[in-house]
């Protein structure tokens, strides 16, 4: 930036406020509901957990690297604008590919209807019958013999499949909820196993009966088969007629087909496509927030107004609340399919792209400044090195890791739990807004809390509140019950991070507080969320959502006990280097004992005390 340019702080803050507001509106139109879209693609919890885990891992590595590479004003502006534009396009691509199955979309859409309309829903057998079976074996096959007569061969596979699916569909005719959980059994693996065992016995029984019937008719059909073989024998040696493969060839072919089908079945193909698309999307979107925050902070630091940087998150929370309510209200007032048979879930991506395009135009005016000092590029490295140098920071880092790991289960699968009990998306949006606004309301009492409670008890209060939330989630009974418990989010999220930020200010060396705070958030929402996403998906697949949330509650209670035992034993004395208070360049600061001994002001004070003779 030119030195002759006028520095308008009010205008810069106004643009930054609108930037963060619109970006969070667009972000919360889609991101909290992304796993619902993956579920409609037919992906299970374990596959969704892998996708989200890789998404967090890419952000963990790519965002700080891009921030390090963007060392000039032009590069930072380019990263911000390109990230907004390309991520909007990459997100909008999901609205068209991979395509959604209309039967699955209708099934999910039906769960959000009013309760009176769910009592006797129409049964569509095509939802439950496999497509290949219905098209290939649904009707008996007629074959004409050499005598001109028709023999009807029973399609036993189709009869068994239709019988079992009709039985299951009749069982599910009473309520839509039962029908929904049978098609997408994320929370009832025992029921699914029993039903599978019952259907297996039925298939085996029908197979034995079929075998007995076929043995009776084999004698009558043997003459027809022999005459048919005699008539077709002259054609067997024709070069254009393929011969029947040998037993060895059939075995090799069957093995290769089984391997290909098991590895590249439709579900895994969709999984690999979605995983690749999400990774590319995250590569495009990850640099935005980190670089934008660094640019604004260094801009305000240059004009000595960094105190105004800490309040921009309020506008981000307001935008997130408005975005979540807006998109869910819109979705619930749309039909299952709108013009051109576009499913209504696609409007999450359309609104995301639209608001990011609006933010793109604001980015042309976004305040960007790159400090000429070298200490800004070294602060992140110092913060990483500081994580292992102080026991209090190590304990805090482990706490935020646990917090990020268990918190990812709420972000990824809470709406699955709500969907299983028949919730529409409006309740989901209200739950997001309730949590954010409750944290925003408690913020005005933050200083009073910091004065009343110590760091230890604020962390315990936050972890205990989060544990209560998890226990509550495991026993959800109605959709609206989630909105009430989200009030505790003010303590489980807000109070913990306020306590951590205050601890960082007390422990970190001057000038590195913000870098250490960013590092801890990077550890929580990068490492912790990635590990939590990977683990939670497999836990849901093996057990259920309720078991997952109960396990998270037990984990938090266990960590509270560990925290209370370890925290009092850590040293609580901070070494103060007085000469750094007068230093003009923060890059020369050091917290080592050797530097403490060489402090000229401390040495002078010691000499003065030793020379006194009273």
From Swiss-Prot:
One matching Pfam family: MFS_1_like
InterPro entries per record: MFS_assoc_dom, MFS_MFSD6, MFS_trans_sf
Record carries keyword Ribosomal protein: no
Membrane topology: Multi-pass membrane protein
Main localization category: membrane
Cellular component terms per the entry's GO annotation: membrane
TM helices/strands, residue ranges: 41-61, 78-98, 270-290, 312-332, 345-365, 393-413, 425-445, 457-477, 480-500, 520-540, 546-566
Stretches the record annotates as Disordered: 177-243
Localization (cell): Membrane
Extent of Low complexity compositional bias: 205-227
Similarity-based family: Belongs to the major facilitator superfamily. MFSD6 family.
Protein name per Swiss-Prot or TrEMBL: Major facilitator superfamily domain-containing protein 6-like protein B
Organism: Xenopus laevis
Lineage, top ranks: Eukaryota, Metazoa, Chordata, Craniata, Vertebrata
């Amino acid at each position: 930036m030119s030195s002759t340019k006028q520095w308008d702080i009010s205008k810069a803050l106004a643009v930054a406020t609108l930037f963060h507001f619109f970006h969070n509106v667009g972000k919360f139109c889609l991101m909290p509901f992304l796993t619902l879209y993956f579920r409609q693609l037919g992906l299970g919890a374990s596959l969704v957990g892998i996708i989200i885990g890789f998404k967090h891992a890419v952000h963990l590595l790519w965002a700080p690297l891009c921030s390090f590479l963007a060392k000039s004003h032009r590069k930072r502006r380019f990263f911000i604008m390109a990230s907004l534009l390309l991520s909007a396009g990459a997100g909008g691509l999901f609205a068209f590919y991979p395509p959604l199955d209309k039967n699955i979309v209708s099934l999910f859409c039906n769960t959000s209807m009013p309760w009176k309309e769910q009592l006797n829903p129409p049964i569509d057998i095509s939802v439950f019958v496999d497509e290949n079976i219905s098209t290939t074996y649904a009707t008996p096959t007629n074959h004409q013999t050499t005598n001109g007569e028709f023999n009807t061969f029973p399609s036993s596979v189709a009869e068994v499949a239709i019988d079992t699916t009709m039985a299951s569909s009749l069982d599910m005719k009473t309520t839509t909820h039962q029908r929904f959980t049978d098609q997408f059994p994320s929370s009832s693996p025992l029921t699914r196993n029993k039903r599978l065992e019952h259907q297996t016995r039925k298939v085996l029984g029908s197979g034995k009966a079929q075998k007995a019937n076929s043995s009776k008719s084999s004698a009558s059909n043997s003459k027809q088969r022999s005459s048919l073989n005699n008539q077709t024998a002259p054609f067997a040696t024709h070069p254009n007629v393929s011969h029947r493969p040998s037993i060895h060839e059939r075995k090799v072919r069957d093995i290769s087909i089984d391997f290909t089908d098991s590895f590249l079945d439709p579900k895994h193909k969709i999984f690999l496509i979605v995983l690749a698309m999400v990774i590319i999307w995250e590569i495009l979107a990850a640099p935005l927030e980190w670089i934008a925050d660094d640019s604004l902070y260094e801009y305000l630091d240059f004009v000595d107004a960094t105190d105004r940087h800490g309040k921009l998150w309020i506008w981000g929370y307001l935008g997130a609340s408005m975005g979540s309510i807006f998109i869910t209200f819109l979705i619930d007032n749309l039909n299952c399919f709108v013009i051109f048979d576009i499913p209504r879930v696609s409007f999450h991506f359309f609104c995301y792209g639209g608001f990011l395009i609006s933010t793109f135009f604001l980015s042309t005016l976004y305040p960007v400044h790159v400090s000429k000092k070298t200490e800004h590029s070294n602060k992140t490295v110092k913060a990483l090195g500081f994580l292992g140098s102080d026991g209090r920071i190590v304990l805090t880092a482990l706490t935020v890791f646990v917090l990020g790991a268990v918190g990812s289960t709420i972000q990824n699968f809470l709406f699955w739990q709500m969907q299983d009990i028949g919730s529409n998306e409006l309740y989901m949006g209200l739950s997001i807004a309730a949590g954010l606004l409750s944290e925003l309301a408690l913020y005005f009492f933050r200083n009073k809390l910091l004065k009343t409670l110590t760091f230890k008890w604020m962390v315990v209060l936050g972890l205990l509140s989060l544990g209560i939330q998890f226990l509550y989630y495991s026993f959800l009974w109605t959709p609206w019950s989630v909105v009430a418990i989200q009030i505790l989010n003010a303590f489980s999220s807000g109070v913990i991070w306020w306590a951590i930020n205050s601890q960082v200010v007390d422990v970190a060396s001057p000038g590195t507080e913000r870098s250490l705070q960013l590092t801890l958030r990077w550890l929580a929402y990068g490492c912790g969320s990635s590990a939590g996403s990977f683990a939670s998906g497999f836990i849901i697949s093996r057990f259920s959502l309720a078991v997952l949330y109960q396990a998270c509650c037990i984990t938090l209670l266990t960590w509270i006990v560990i925290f209370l035992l370890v925290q009092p034993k850590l040293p609580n004395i901070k070494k103060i280097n007085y000469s750094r208070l007068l230093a003009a360049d923060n890059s020369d600061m050091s917290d080592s004992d050797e530097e403490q001994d060489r402090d000229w002001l401390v040495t002078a004070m010691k000499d003065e005390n030793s020379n006194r003779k009273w």
